[in-house]
Amino acid sequence: MEQFRNIGIIGRLGSSQVLDTVRRLKRFLLDRHLHVILEDTIAEVLPGHGLQTSSRKMLGEVCDMVIVVGGDGSLLGAARALAKHNIPVLGINRGSLGFLTDIRPDELEIKVAEVLDGHYLVENRFLLQAEVRRHAEAIGQGDALNDVVLHPGKSTRMIEFELYIDGQFVCSQKADGLIVATPTGSTAYALSAGGPIMHPKLDAIVIVPMYPHTLSGRPIVVDGNSELKIVVSKDMQIYPQVSCDGQNHFTCAPGDTITVSKKAQKLRLIHPLDHNYYEVCRTKLGWGSKLGGGGD
């Protein structure tokens, strides 16, 4: 197992609970004589921290591991910035759900110590890359760990588009939009739209129509190496948007083409050894527990 000596910390802004957890994490890491580097944005709200600071972009170059304190949204943003550096990322949950940031604050010292001592699991989660092209020229591009979503933006009108997979025409559709999700993102927006849950180890992409104006529109799961092309109808009166993880947005025009494919670099997501994906689903999604045993 890798030895982690230079630890970066990213924290969600605007939360006193996050700041308290970052301070606690900092003290714990320093007590273990590790080199701690704060992302510059969180460092600005921690006066007197006395630590090295770095931009998020540079953290991937100077750290052995990055710990994200926040919710899944915080980890999504960190993942897009750090995946290209092949650096392990660990999440401490200070959000509402915690599918990706799976260490509870009350077990911080115990679980982080286990990871630092080499007792951990690594999952390689792939990302999607999206590009919007207009008249054969790229006008926007972004990455997503969860999903790439075509949606009407502020408009309430439906979008008309054509879908192609690996150059083959699949369908034309009129809908509120289209969600293209990774296995990681299958428990996010895609799940709310009626998509299936996919295990993170699957090499697959799920395509989920949003409120299609048809009785036969259903999600479809395709090979993870597929290249998707979405062509926005030239006859539309609105300018839809493409969103990557709900955080980066691009405005499309009628006739634009959106391509979505797997990104070469993957996120190295660290979990404690007792991590159980099905337990996470059961806890976060409210699945039923085991039937209670009993006597006669």
UniProtKB/Swiss-Prot annotation:
Q: Which reaction does it catalyse?
A: NAD(+) + ATP = ADP + NADP(+) + H(+)
InterPro entries, alphabetized? ATP-NAD_kinase_N, ATP-NAD_kinase_PpnK-typ_C, NAD/diacylglycerol_kinase_sf, NADK
Record keywords, A-Z:
ATP-binding, Cytoplasm, Kinase, NAD, NADP, Nucleotide-binding, Transferase
Q: Name one GO cellular component term.
A: cytoplasm
- Can you tell me which residues bind NAD(+)? D72, G73, N146, D147, R157, K174, D176, T187, A188, Y189, A190, L191, S192, Q247
What molecular function terms (GO) are annotated for this protein?
A: ATP binding; metal ion binding; NAD binding; NAD+ kinase activity
Q: Cofactors per UniProt?
A: a divalent metal cation
EC no. given is: 2.7.1.23
Q: Catalytic residues? A: D72 (proton acceptor)
- An example of a Gene Ontology BP annotation on this entry? NAD metabolic process
Under the heading Pfam families, the entry gives: NAD_kinase (PF01513), NAD_kinase_C (PF20143)
Enzyme class label? transferase
Question: What Gene3D superfamilies would the database entry show?
Answer: Probable inorganic polyphosphate/atp-NAD kinase, domain 1, Probable inorganic polyphosphate/atp-NAD kinase, domain 2
What is the superkingdom listed in this entry's lineage?
A: Bacteria
| Cell location | Cytoplasm
Signal sequence region? none
Could you say which protein family the record assigns here? Belongs to the NAD kinase family.
> PANTHER family recorded for this chain?
NAD KINASE
What HAMAP family does the database record attribute to this sequence?
Answer: NAD_kinase
Q: Explain the purpose of this protein.
A: Involved in the regulation of the intracellular balance of NAD and NADP, and is a key enzyme in the biosynthesis of NADP. Catalyzes specifically the phosphorylation on 2'-hydroxyl of the adenosine moiety of NAD to yield NADP.
| Full protein name | NAD kinase
